[in-house]
């Protein structure tokens, strides 16, 4: 199993990957596509900058009282029937997860895409324990089958094109799926093969492992945003669910999601919403796993929290927007960074999370940037990545000096000796000119020699001239010619020039001394500012919460109000008080038409009905899709059931486990509400909605939406929903863009999605 531990430092790795022209072409095409989609959507959202400001403030506020929020989160998860484990590092987290899986005698786990589990190398720990790991995200499956490494935070196989993926599937998937090979490398055909390959594994899985995009302290809820439906499969079907979540993912309140959900999909893939957003807390009777474990991971986060500058990186929501605009990433790819976190955010996260001052790979990352600032311009939580890069570069130099930099001190001493003596300086000019002219007769050099190697790797360096300027002056004017400083027009100017010439050696000595003094001053940290080392550890024993509390005691964060001037804000009471938004969404009478437009843009279809024609409309939709065997919640209103047509309709309370649901053609359910701005329907387990698996396993889903349930935007939706409810947000059929950024509908969730909209 490959991992990043054998990676070369960035300067050497980048040379290797720059030579891979196919990878560069794949990246250039993919990142350009995402940039264009994001740019178009940001132009549409007039309050995007206000959302970014609010998101940064919410994350900073959460970090500033993270110890209290962790305790609140733990209490609420336990109250909902879950179990909470705190892990100080990767080894502790892996022991917890392996222990749970082993205790349940499971030989296989299914996994949702998770950066946190990749960070701790959980797959490797599970395999060592004799447990098979099945990656269920399409891109992660491509990486796993290809024995490759991920190269992007959101699209891990972005460096692969469709032809390469086809070859991987033909070589590694079972013959009953691939047959004699794929007739084409069409992304839809490849995605369908992945669906077939994974379906039986989902249905038989006893244990699943996930991460989370957010953990809500107020309710104890986990939030997972995904596209393919594999996340819903893992979160809903197995008996046991283990979520490994970094402590930096905690946010205070359910209401805060109204900000992050508007930013995440837009920044990650240029979409208004990802097809699926799942929220759950603890365990629920007959709805999802019967056992839930939350592993809260530190692994360097509390140490990062102690750095007043570096802790900005903990705001990150893993959207990868910075990767998509980075000119360095686009040319060298993600593997060159030697970390599960590539790109600009990886260059500031990895060195801080690893806390290893002597790791050459981590040490090189802050220098893997041009500091152009494009990353800071697109970051949805306003992380000033260029500032962090400079900050970490400074810390890297400090550590190198503390380990002893004899070469640098020797160079400074030699420079002082040469600059303090005109005779030595002139001798050096003559020698360097003679050597340079002999070795490089063309007068230019690209030779990668000594300290010039990084400069000359990309530039021609001028060779010292054979005849220095002073020698040329003497030959042109003779030994008796006027000295350079005596070309002044007046006697006073000439006297001043002679004094300057006599003072030159002393000035050179002072310059050399100043250079040595500055080197010592930096090494000793004489500026007086406290700069936490990567190796800083809490000075007292204790768990994760204790480490966080100590970090905040040593480096407190001042509380600040969260500005909320985005569209629809201001309805959450005094705690969220704000001035009225100037970016108001269209009033409610326009919301229905906007919902229809946005929902259909994802590939869903909308049929209109009146209260008296719902059954006929539902029947027509089922007939159109050739769905015959229908399952509905036990409390779905009777007048909504089709009375005409050759349909077999049964209530869900008479259906057995998930395997039985998978055999049904379609499900018909009600909803909690619909969101016009994003074209989303929301299910929260209320009347007529049934268990979560009901809207997941049948290949055709019909959702009945009443006109009064349509709200304008996310803030309106959040105020209507119960924070403690298990929720499923659906924005179109399941989909993937993991193959060359081509959108393919219908992966693991329903491939056909209809809304019957009941007008008032």
Roles of regions detected by a PLM:
Residues 447, 458-461, 487, 501, ...:
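Generic N-terminal simple sequence motifs
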Residues 287-313, 324, 328-457, 493, ...:
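Ferredoxin-type iron-sulfur electron-transfer modules in oxidoreductases and energy-metabolism complexes
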Residues 439, 473-480, 548, 552, ...:
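C-terminal alpha-helix/helix-terminus motif
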Residues 449-499, 503-514:
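C-terminal non-catalytic accessory extensions
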């Amino acid at each position: 199993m490959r991992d990043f531990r054998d990676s070369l430092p960035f300067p050497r790795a980048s040379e290797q990957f720059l030579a891979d022209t196919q990878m560069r072409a794949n990246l250039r095409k993919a990142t350009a596509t995402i940039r264009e989609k994001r740019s178009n959507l940001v132009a549409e959202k007039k309050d995007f900058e206000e959302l970014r400001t609010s998101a940064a403030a919410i994350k900073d506020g959460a970090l500033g009282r993270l110890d209290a929020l962790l305790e609140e989160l733990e209490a609420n998860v336990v109250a909902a029937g879950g179990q909470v484990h705190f892990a100080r590092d990767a080894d502790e987290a892996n022991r917890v997860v392996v222990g749970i899986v082993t205790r349940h005698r499971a030989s296989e786990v299914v996994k949702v895409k998770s950066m946190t589990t990749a960070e701790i190398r959980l797959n490797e720990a599970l395999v060592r324990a004799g447990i098979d790991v099945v990656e269920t995200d399409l891109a992660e499956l491509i990486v796993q089958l290809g024995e490759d490494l991920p190269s992007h935070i959101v699209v891990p196989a972005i460096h692969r094109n469709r032809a390469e993926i086809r070859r991987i599937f033909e070589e590694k998937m079972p013959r009953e799926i691939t047959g004699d090979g794929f007739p084409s490398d069409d992304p839809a055909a490849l995605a369908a093969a992945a669906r077939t390959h994974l379906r039986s594994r989902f249905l038989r899985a006893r244990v699943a492992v996930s991460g989370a995009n957010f953990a809500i302290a107020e309710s104890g809820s986990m939030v997972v945003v995904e596209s393919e439906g594999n996340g819903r499969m893992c979160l809903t079907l197995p008996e046991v669910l283990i979520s490994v979540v970094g402590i930096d993912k905690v946010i205070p309140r359910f209401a805060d999601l109204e900000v992050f959900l508007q930013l995440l999909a837009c920044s990650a893939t240029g979409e208004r919403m990802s097809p699926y957003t799942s929220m759950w807390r603890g365990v629920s009777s007959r709805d999802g796993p019967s056992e839930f474990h939350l592993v809260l991971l530190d692994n360097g986060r509390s140490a990062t929290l102690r750095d007043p500058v570096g802790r900005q990186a903990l705001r990150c929501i893993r959207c990868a927007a910075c990767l998509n605009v980075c000119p360095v990433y686009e040319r060298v790819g993600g593997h060159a960074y030697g970390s599960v976190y590539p790109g600009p955010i990886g260059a500031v996260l990895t060195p801080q999370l690893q806390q290893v001052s002597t790791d050459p790979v981590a040490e090189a990352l802050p220098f893997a940037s041009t500091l152009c600032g494009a990353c800071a311009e697109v970051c949805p939580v306003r992380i000033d990545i260029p500032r962090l890069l400079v900050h970490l570069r400074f810390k890297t130099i400090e550590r190198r000096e503390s380990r002893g930099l004899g070469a640098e001190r020797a160079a400074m001493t030699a420079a002082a000796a040469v600059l303090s003596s005109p005779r030595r300086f002139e001798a050096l000019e003559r020698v360097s000119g003679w050597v340079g002219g002999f070795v490089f007769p063309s007068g230019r050099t690209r030779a990668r020699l000594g300290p010039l190697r990084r400069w000359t790797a990309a530039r021609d360096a001028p060779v010292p001239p054979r005849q220095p300027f002073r020698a040329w002056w003497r030959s042109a004017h003779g030994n008796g010619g006027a000295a350079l400083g005596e070309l002044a027009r007046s006697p006073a100017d000439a006297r001043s020039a002679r004094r300057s010439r006599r003072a030159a050696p002393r000035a050179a000595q002072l310059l050399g001394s100043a250079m040595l003094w500055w080197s010592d001053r930096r090494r000793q940290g004489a500026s007086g500012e406290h700069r936490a080392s990567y190796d800083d550890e809490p000075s007292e024993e204790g768990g994760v919460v204790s480490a966080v509390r100590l970090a905040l005691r040593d480096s407190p964060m001042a509380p600040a109000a969260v500005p909320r001037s985005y569209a629809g804000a201001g309805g959450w009471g005094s705690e969220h008080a704000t001035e009225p938004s100037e970016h108001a969404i269209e009033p409610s009478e326009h919301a229905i038409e906007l919902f229809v437009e946005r929902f259909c843009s994802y590939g869903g279809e909308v049929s209109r009905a009146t209260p008296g024609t719902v059954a006929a409309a539902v029947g027509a939709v089922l007939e159109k899709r050739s769905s015959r065997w229908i399952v509905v919640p036990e409390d779905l209103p009777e007048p909504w059931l089709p009375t005409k047509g050759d349909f077999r309709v049964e209530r869900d309370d008479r259906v057995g486990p998930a395997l039985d649901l998978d055999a049904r053609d379609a499900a018909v359910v009600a909803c909690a509400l619909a969101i016009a701005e994003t074209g989303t329907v929301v299910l929260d387990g209320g009347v007529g909605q049934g268990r979560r698996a009901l809207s997941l396993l049948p290949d055709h889903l019909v959702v009945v939406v009443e006109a009064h349930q349509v709200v304008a935007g996310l803030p309106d939706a959040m105020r209507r929903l119960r924070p403690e409810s298990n929720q499923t947000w659906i924005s179109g059929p399941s989909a993937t863009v993991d193959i060359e950024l081509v959108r393919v509908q219908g992966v693991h969730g329903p491939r056909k999605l209809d809304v019957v909209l009941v007008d008032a």
